């Protein structure tokens, strides 16, 4: 391509004029068959491009566009990564801010609770400090500077905010030189922190209230221990600040608050129960309260046997001796048995004392034929129409007292079924049947489920039945008729199998109590690991990702023990569990 060929069509056009129309036409017709005619047909001012140059330029343009697209995609990807990183940091900072705000609120509430005379000015100063710090953060952003200045001008600033040298910092971000002394007034956050720690320890110990009731009651009943604990907390305030100042400014929220730690510890703490679901580890049958109540049942059985023997002896004496001698002897023996029962059952002592003064015509007491299990209980006193609002037996109606005296007389003269305070007891029933029922359910001796809510007669109807009862008493007071109606009774001491079964049940209950005592131990041994320490040991394992956390938690729950600080596990058990799960 040359310069002359490019300018030729333009020169030819300028050479031709309107006067030379024939020449131009002839020239145009002559050039129609030549190669120059093709060049003349193109638009003027356009340079003709060769094929190689055009292809090369197209390839360069496409390469440049491709490189631009790659750079744009790479830049967009970097921006997207940066945005996602900033979003995660923002979410983490928001979560941390929310946690710290809640912590400050809890500290203020605890401070108000333990120091109600605290002036409200401190709260307002703290809130003003927080507001000023937020204002400083807004001023650093140019977008919100105008709005922040307008808000600051519309409100009156307090004297605390007017200090320009103030800078709010968290304790772990402060320098050791700037930490206030414990004796100054600015130690209220530290005091509230120690109070919060003390409250947290109390809340943790309350989760195991069923297992460590005695230790907690002792510690809470002595105010000197509480005062000593609070004084030690306040004395360690400076050490707390110095420890927190060594922490880096970057708060590792994920490592400090791992969700898996809380789930693992919540599952492991089920071995000791929780506040919402206090499940004891032992069965309800073997609780100490029930075993303490049922301990003297063997002694009560012996007393019943002695009572039956005394009745038989007194009747034998009545046939050959005067009536007052036999009555005095049996009264003496029965008085001893009642004293033995009253010593074992302190709950029924008042009832025995009140009813002991009422003597029957034969000289026997009302409660001489009443065993410990026939004393008034909730079901008896709570559903009587004459004692709904007065549970004192001395203030009962005269009709009820007369009824009890009449039935007591009937019981003392004959071996017919006796009625004591609404409960029927047949001393002539073979005691082997009672022992067999006791062996089926050793925790509830001689209790019939039908007597849970006895059917009492209305005291208003006792007036109509008084004549029938008097007639029955007169008929039963005949000694000859009593001897005719007498039925043989079988003493309890002649059944060695029952005594062996009772001893076995007592041994089982004692062993259950020992197991409960062994499960409740203080967590002051260095070999016992708390839940957080167990989790640290599990996560530090090199093959942590291969562990079955749920199975490991279930295995450790069976070996966990309850302490005052929560659930603890022996270090050897943790190591054995890790080894067994890695095989």
Curated annotation (Swiss-Prot):
Renumbered residue ranges of the record's region Leucine-zipper: 79-86
Keyword Transcription assigned: yes
Motif (Nuclear export signal): 547-554
Keywords attached to this entry: Activator, Cytoplasm, Disulfide bond, DNA-binding, Nucleus, Transcription, Transcription regulation
Keyword Ligase: no
Domain of life from the UniProt record: Eukaryota
Biased composition regions of type Basic and acidic residues, renumbered to the chain: 8-17, 47-58, 67-84
Post-translational modification: Oxidative stress induces conformational changes through oxidation of cysteine residues, masking the nuclear export signal, thus abolishing nuclear export by CRM1/exportin 1.
Region (n-CRD): 265-272
Ranges for region Disordered: 1-86, 177-233, 275-329, 350-373
GO CC terms: cytoplasm; RNA polymerase II transcription regulator complex
Biased composition (Basic residues): 37-46
Pfam name, any one: PAP1
CDD domains per record: bZIP_YAP (cd14688)
Biased composition (Polar residues): 196-207, 316-329
Location of the motif Bipartite nuclear localization signal: 41-48, 120-127
Locations listed in the record: Nucleus; Cytoplasm
Record region (Basic motif): 54-77
Ranges of compositional bias, category Low complexity: 24-36, 177-195, 208-230, 297-312
Biological process per Gene Ontology, one example term: cellular response to stress
Region of interest (c-CRD), residue spans: 531-562
Family: Belongs to the bZIP family. YAP subfamily.
Biological role: Transcription activator involved in oxidative stress response and cadmium resistance. Regulates the transcription of genes encoding antioxidant enzymes and components of the cellular thiol-reducing pathways. Activity of the transcription factor is controlled through oxidation of specific cysteine residues resulting in the alteration of its subcellular location. Activation by alkyl hydroperoxides or cadmium induces nuclear accumulation and as a result YAP1 transcriptional activity.
Name under which the protein is recorded: AP-1-like transcription factor YAP1
Organism placement in taxonomy: Eukaryota, Fungi, Dikarya, Ascomycota, Saccharomycotina
């Amino acid at each position: 391509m040359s310069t002359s060929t490019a300018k030729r069509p333009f020169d030819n056009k300028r050479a031709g004029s309107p006067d030379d129309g024939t020449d131009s036409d002839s020239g145009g017709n002559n050039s129609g068959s030549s190669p120059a005619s093709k060049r003349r047909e193109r638009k003027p001012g356009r340079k003709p491009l060769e094929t190689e140059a055009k292809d090369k330029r197209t390839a360069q343009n496409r390469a440049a566009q491709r490189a631009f697209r790659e750079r744009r995609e790479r830049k967009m990807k970097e921006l997207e990564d940066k945005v996602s990183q900033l979003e995660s940091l923002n979410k983490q900072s928001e979560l941390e801010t929310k946690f710290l705000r809640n912590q400050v609120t809890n500290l203020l509430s605890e401070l108000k609770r333990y120091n109600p005379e605290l002036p409200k000015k401190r709260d307002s100063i703290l809130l003003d400090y927080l507001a000023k710090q937020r204002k400083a953060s807004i001023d650093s952003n140019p977008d919100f500077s105008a709005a922040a200045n307008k808000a600051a001008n519309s409100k009156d600033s307090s004297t605390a905010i007017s200090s320009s040298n103030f800078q709010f910092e968290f304790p772990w971000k402060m320098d050791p030189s700037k930490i206030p002394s414990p004796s100054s007034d600015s130690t209220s956050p530290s005091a509230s922190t120690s109070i919060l720690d003390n409250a947290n320890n109390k809340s943790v110990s309350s989760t195991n209230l069923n297992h460590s009731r005695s230790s907690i009651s002792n510690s809470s009943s002595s105010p000197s221990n509480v005062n000593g604990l609070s004084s030690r907390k306040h004395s360690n305030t400076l050490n707390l600040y110095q420890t927190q100042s060594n922490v880096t400014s970057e708060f590792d929220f994920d490592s400090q608050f791992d969700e898996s730690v809380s789930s693992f510890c919540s599952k492991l703490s089920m071995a000791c129960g929780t506040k919402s679901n206090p499940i004891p580890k032992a069965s309800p049958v073997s609780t100490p309260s029930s075993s303490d109540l049922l301990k003297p049942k063997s002694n009560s059985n012996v007393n019943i046997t002695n009572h039956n023997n005394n009745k038989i002896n007194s009747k034998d004496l009545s046939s050959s001796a005067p009536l007052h001698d036999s009555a005095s002897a049996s009264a003496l023996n029965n008085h001893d048995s009642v004293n033995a029962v009253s010593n074992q059952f302190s709950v029924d002592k008042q009832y025995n004392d009140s009813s002991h003064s009422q003597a029957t015509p034969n000289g026997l007491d009302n409660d001489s034929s009443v065993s410990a299990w026939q004393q008034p209980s909730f079901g008896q006193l709570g559903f009587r129409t004459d004692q709904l609002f007065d549970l004192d037996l001395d203030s009962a109606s005269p009709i009820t007292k007369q009824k009890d005296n009449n039935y007591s007389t009937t019981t003392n003269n004959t071996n017919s079924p006796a009625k004591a305070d609404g409960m029927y007891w047949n001393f002539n029933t073979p005691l082997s049947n009672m022992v067999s029922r006791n062996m089926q359910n050793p925790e509830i001796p001689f209790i019939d489920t039908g007597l849970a809510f006895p059917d009492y007669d209305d005291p208003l109807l006792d007036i109509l039945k008084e004549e029938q009862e008097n007639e029955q008493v007169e008929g039963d007071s005949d000694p000859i008729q009593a001897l005719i109606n007498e039925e043989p009774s079988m003493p309890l001491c002649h059944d060695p199998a029952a005594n062996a079964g009772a001893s076995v049940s007592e041994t089982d209950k004692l062993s259950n109590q020992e197991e409960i005592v062994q499960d409740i131990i203080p967590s002051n041994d260095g070999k016992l690991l708390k839940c957080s320490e167990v989790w640290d040991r599990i996560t530090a394992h090199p093959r942590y990702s291969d562990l079955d956390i749920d199975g490991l938690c279930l295995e450790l729950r069976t070996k966990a023990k309850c302490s005052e600080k929560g659930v603890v596990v022996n270090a050897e058990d943790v190591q054995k569990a890790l080894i067994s799960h890695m095989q």
